[in-house]
Amino acid sequence: MKKIYIYSCLIILSAISAQGTVEINYFYSDVLQVDCGYTIHLPEGYDDSDEHYPTLYFLHGFGANHYLIYGGIHDIIDTLVSVGQVDPFIIVRPDVSTSPYLGSFYTNSALYGDFEDYIIYDLIEHIDNTYRTIDHRLYRGIGGHSMGGYGATKLGIKYYDLFGSISSHSGALVFDNLTDLIPDLMYETSWSPLGLFMPTNGFVSLFMFGASGAFSPNLDLPPWYVDLPVDCNGDVIQSVWDLWMPHDPQRIAQD
């Protein structure tokens, strides 16, 4: 009953709390050579003051983008600010969805493009030059969900001089655990008409192709242009797995 009461109070507070401004904007990325979108939440009163604000970069999950699924975050932020739980801050949600497998894993890839460099060298500079941020690592955080949680952890560790905080929600932090997906991958493949690995076999298959596009792309291997780290018997291909390991957050932290 207590949990229901608290949840009801949050709903009521969300309805009556001061509202920030949510915008979807685009800018040209020199790294990716295309116009890139992002959703930004500016705190209530942003246009009426000269105040500078901390910034949180929130990275979306696999199969999502900057405007789907996570819209409720803005209401939660407004509520927390209204009740004094947090100070006002800016939240930026960049779009790193990409074809053909729906997610870049915030990684530089010959197949997808250099999305790590896009975040680090293009997006942050654009946001700091366009909005009244506090351009200091102690006032810049990075977080995300699922694939975004992985990306936030990896980028936060690699570029600790840029970020003062890292938060990961359901992100893959240790790649050794990814081998637990192999039975599901093989099960999905068993239902394939040809008994072959295909991204259309199921979600785990799509995820494995997506991750392979980030960590082990092979532009000389049509039609999928990736090297999967698993063979037809469900055994790990060590030479491909070794290409994944430099992107393992645990390994990055240890280095």
Protein language model features and the residues they cover:
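Sec-dependent N-terminal signal peptides
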Residues: 3-18
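Non-catalytic cap/lid and distal C-terminal segments of serine-dependent acyl enzymes
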Residues: 19-255
